[in-house]
Amino acid sequence: MISVNDFRTGLTIEVDGEIWRVLEFQHVKPGKGAAFVRSKLRNLRTGAIQERTFRAGEKVNRAQIDTRKMQYLYANGDLHVFMDMETYEQIELPAKQIEYELKFLKENMEVFIMMYQGETIGVELPNTVELKVVETEPGIKGDTASGGSKPAKLETGLVVQVPFFVNEGDTLIINTADGTYVSRA
């Protein structure tokens, strides 16, 4: 059991029989009434995001998540195939379960697969990934001083806002937490 006062980003908890990851949290102490913790949680089985409020000091179960290092191999229709790097065992995950993560996955990329009581519940991405720009408007000379941005489509289909100096074929570093441009690789 863990107190909601000890929440931190990335913590996995079990509430109402479901496994949740804490995305955001805020301790609120109103002038009148009891303190509470407002949180934004992601269901690791379904990918659904829910905002939930807990009373300060309330206890929840901490979910013990095991991780296995695996390599993303390929998509087979609606299923995505991963291989354990040590045992060469392959598992398949439905696209619906890893919908967000698919924006960042490339073939042969190493990731951690999250397991809860033997059940595969999701993919843990690295903090950043390198992705190649496949489509963007050409930068206009002299535009770099304005500090604006333009959309760029990456090799996985993800569209991000990038500075004007980024061109097709450039490799970019993308933050997987929010899908934003960090820098050129």
Curated annotation (Swiss-Prot):
One cellular component GO annotation, for this chain's record?
cytoplasm
What is the name listed in the Swiss-Prot or TrEMBL entry for this protein? Elongation factor P
Protein function:
Involved in peptide bond synthesis. Stimulates efficient translation and peptide-bond synthesis on native or reconstituted 70S ribosomes in vitro. Probably functions indirectly by altering the affinity of the ribosome for aminoacyl-tRNA, thus increasing their reactivity as acceptors for peptidyl transferase.
Q: What is a single Pfam family found in this protein's UniProt entry?
A: Elong-fact-P_C
Q: What is the originating organism of this protein?
A: Geobacillus thermodenitrificans (strain NG80-2)
One record GO biological process:
peptide biosynthetic process
Q: Which family does it belong to?
A: Belongs to the elongation factor P family.
> Which Gene3D superfamilies does the UniProt entry name for this protein?
2.30.30.30, Nucleic acid-binding proteins
Query: What keywords tag this UniProt record?
Result: Cytoplasm, Elongation factor, Protein biosynthesis
